[in-house]
């Protein structure tokens, strides 16, 4: 049999697990003040939340033990040492993994987490073993006091991870359906890819890599509005072909008609609008569109614009 190099596939699998871990943290924290994610920076990913900085290393390896965490392969820094290196003494460090040796797991101390519901700290026995083996200095010892282990609720399998994350978003009442959750996961995954590819050589590069809470909030708002758009469109008494054309026109709005949409929203009487059913509300907004743009014909575009306005006014 021909020998096959699986290095690329293994690396991709590891990166997918890393992305799933980032998205899990995003789901639980994006609505908090000053939330920022920086992928592929000083660690696999970096989190800023309020005044705290977290350096997170992600390991998709099976049966990780204290022995493996402190091992120095080919003389290189161990997993523990790498995670202790970046940032300042007071920063928080986490090692995300999915599979841990039973003996190592039994000795960990469980406690309530901040980024995630549950985290684990090393026992005194485990810390002593690591300190002695790696000959850690005083600063490294102090840094290790803020180092924790987190066992993810999904394995190093992207399909199982995505299934869990979709359910998590629905459970957190962020989205009402798995289909919309799938769209969000695609958007977040793509954004993590884009930011990860930015090579850091200056401080401005680090700024470009940031994914902040405002961006994440907008992603969820956009998906919710798309869901609402489809629901309202389904309630209108127009035929299937017209509905398909309306959806097509919607794609043009951000590029060509954003200003008209904003003018319509400003002109709308919210109290009057909220007393109407979907059909009445859309007809009211289409009449406003004609007042703003007299040559706006009663076409699929006017329906798309009116529904888009209605969705945003309802937020």
Swiss-Prot record:
GO molecular function: nuclease activity
Disruption phenotype: When this gene is missing the Lamassu type I system does not confer resistance to SpBeta in B.subtilis.
Protein's name in the database: Lamassu protein LmuA
GO biological process entries: defense response to virus
One Pfam match: Cap4_nuclease
The entry's keywords: Antiviral defense
Role this protein plays: Component of antiviral defense system Lamassu type I, composed of LmuA and LmuB. Expression of Lamassu type I in B.subtilis (strain BEST7003) confers resistance to phages phi3T, SpBeta and SPR.
Taxon lineage: Bacteria, Bacillati, Bacillota, Bacilli, Bacillales
Species per Swiss-Prot/TrEMBL record: Bacillus sp. (strain NCIM 5461 / CCTCC AB 2011126 / NIO-1130)
Keyword Transmembrane belongs to the record: no
């Amino acid at each position: 049999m021909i020998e096959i190099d699986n290095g690329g596939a293994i690396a991709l699998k590891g990166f997918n697990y890393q992305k799933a871990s980032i998205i899990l943290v995003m789901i639980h924290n994006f609505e908090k003040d000053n939330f920022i994610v920086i992928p592929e920076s000083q660690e696999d990913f970096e989190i800023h939340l309020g005044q705290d900085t977290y350096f997170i290393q992600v390991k998709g390896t099976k049966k990780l033990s204290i022995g493996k965490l402190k091992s120095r392969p080919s003389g290189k820094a161990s997993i523990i040492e790498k995670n202790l290196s970046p940032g300042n003494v007071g920063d928080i460090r986490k090692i995300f993994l999915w599979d841990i040796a039973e003996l190592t797991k039994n000795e960990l101390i469980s406690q309530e987490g901040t980024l995630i519901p549950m985290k684990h700290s090393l026992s005194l026995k485990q810390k002593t073993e690591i300190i002695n083996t790696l000959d850690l200095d005083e600063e490294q010892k102090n840094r290790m006091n803020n180092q924790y282990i987190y066992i993810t609720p999904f394995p190093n399998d992207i399909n199982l991870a995505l299934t869990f994350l979709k359910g998590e978003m629905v459970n957190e009442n962020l989205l009402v359906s798995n289909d919309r959750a799938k769209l969000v996961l695609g958007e977040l995954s793509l954004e993590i890819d884009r930011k990860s590819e930015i090579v850091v050589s200056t401080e401005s590069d680090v700024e470009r890599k940031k994914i902040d809470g405002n961006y994440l909030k907008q992603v969820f708002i956009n998906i919710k509005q798309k869901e609402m758009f489809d629901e309202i469109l389904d309630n209108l008494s127009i035929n299937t072909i017209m509905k398909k054309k309306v959806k097509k026109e919607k794609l043009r709005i951000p590029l060509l008609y954003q200003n008209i949409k904003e003018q319509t929203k400003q002109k709308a009487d919210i109290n009057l609008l909220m007393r109407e059913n979907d059909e009445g509300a859309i007809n009211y907004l289409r009449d406003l569109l004609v007042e703003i743009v007299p040559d706006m014909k009663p076409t699929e575009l006017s329906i798309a614009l009116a529904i888009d306005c209605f969705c945003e006014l309802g937020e």
